[in-house]
Amino acid sequence: MTEDSQRNFRSVYYEKVGFRGVEEKKSLEILLKDDRLDTEKLCTFSQRFPLPSMYRALVWKVLLGILPPHHESHAKVMMYRKEQYLDVLHALKVVRFVSDATPQAEVYLRMYQLESGKLPRSPSFPLEPDDEVFLAIAKAMEEMVEDSVDCYWITRRFVNQLNTKYRDSLPQLPKAFEQYLNLEDGRLLTHLRMCSAAPKLPYDLWFKRCFAGCLPESSLQRVWDKVVSGSCKILVFVAVEILLTFKIKVMALNSAEKITKFLENIPQDSSDAIVSKAIDLWHKHCGTPVHSS
């Protein structure tokens, strides 16, 4: 058996017994040992493979610019990040905007508002649509990231990435969704159009909140690996795969309202399979990233 065929045999075996990521984890550990982390290679890895949960927060912090590439600076930089976090939190407590009883995700929202100069005059003011998006993402992030300082910074930078890097791309995603759904199942798209459901699908939930509150966090984090590392287009393929997975149910519904209501509250037990198939679809239509080196 050649070295390549041995490796392929091992990969297939690992996948069958539930250790699909063994070799990928080793590759990531090699990348993380570099004195200066190669963000391009970390992006490529994250686009190709799911990040092991033990390294996810670290990789996200590097890719979102919370940590610099140089290892020796990490402890000092995180110390500054923590000091800033505690200063902002203290300021909010002084002006009685938050208390120890305030839900953590809402604390993150108020901190973000204060730091971006958008804190309302009173905590009782109704939330803006952008605040609702931040809150949904923060609630999901809480389930993925244990440390509260990490969670705030990752949420903040994740939302900033949506508002800057992806600002022009996100409004194009509904059109791309229809395009790829048509390629995968034209009859399904025709049904949505005949029911006048196509313009009324839960696009805000899918593409503004990035499926926060729609998919369980254990599945969602594999989607967000791709978003953090440079592709918001993965969101399109998750939406397409949701429609393909629940095709029989959707085809049986004959009103836009019923279809939208169902898609806003899809059964959770298929989510892992949906995300895996969505990633395969994304690679099929957009290619698999390869290291430039």
Swiss-Prot record:
Residues 50-231 form the Rab-GAP TBC domain. Keywords: Cytoplasm, Cytoplasmic vesicle, GTPase activation, Lysosome, Membrane. GO terms for molecular function: GTPase activator activity; small GTPase binding; TSC1-TSC2 complex binding. It is found in: Lysosome membrane; Cytoplasmic vesicle; Cytoplasm, Cytosol. Changing R121A: Abolished formation of the TSC-TBC complex. One of its GO terms (biological process) is positive regulation of protein ubiquitination. Changing R96A: Decreased interaction with TSC1. It holds the Pfam family RabGAP-TBC. Highly expressed in heart, and slightly in kidney, liver and placenta. The keyword Ribosomal protein does not apply. GO terms for cellular component: ciliary basal body; cytoplasmic vesicle; cytosol; lysosomal membrane; TSC1-TSC2 complex. InterPro entries: Rab-GAP-TBC_dom (IPR000195), Rab-GAP_TBC_sf (IPR035969), TBC1D7 (IPR039842), TBC1D7_dom2 (IPR043039). Component of the TSC-TBC complex (also named Rhebulator complex), composed of 2 molecules of TSC1, 2 molecules of TSC2 and 1 molecule of TBC1D7. Interacts with TSC1 (via C-terminal half of the coiled-coil domain). Non-catalytic component of the TSC-TBC complex, a multiprotein complex that acts as a negative regulator of the canonical mTORC1 complex, an evolutionarily conserved central nutrient sensor that stimulates anabolic reactions and macromolecule biosynthesis to promote cellular biomass generation and growth. The TSC-TBC complex acts as a GTPase-activating protein (GAP) for the small GTPase RHEB, a direct activator of the protein kinase activity of mTORC1. It is linked to Macrocephaly/megalencephaly syndrome, autosomal recessive: An autosomal recessive disorder characterized by abnormal enlargement of the cerebral hemispheres, intellectual disability, large head, optic atrophy and underdeveloped skeletal musculature. Head enlargement may be evident at birth or the head may become abnormally large in the early years of life. Additional clinical features include behavioral abnormalities, psychosis, learning difficulties, prognathism, myopia and astigmatism. PANTHER family: TBC1 DOMAIN FAMILY MEMBER 7. This is TBC1 domain family member 7.
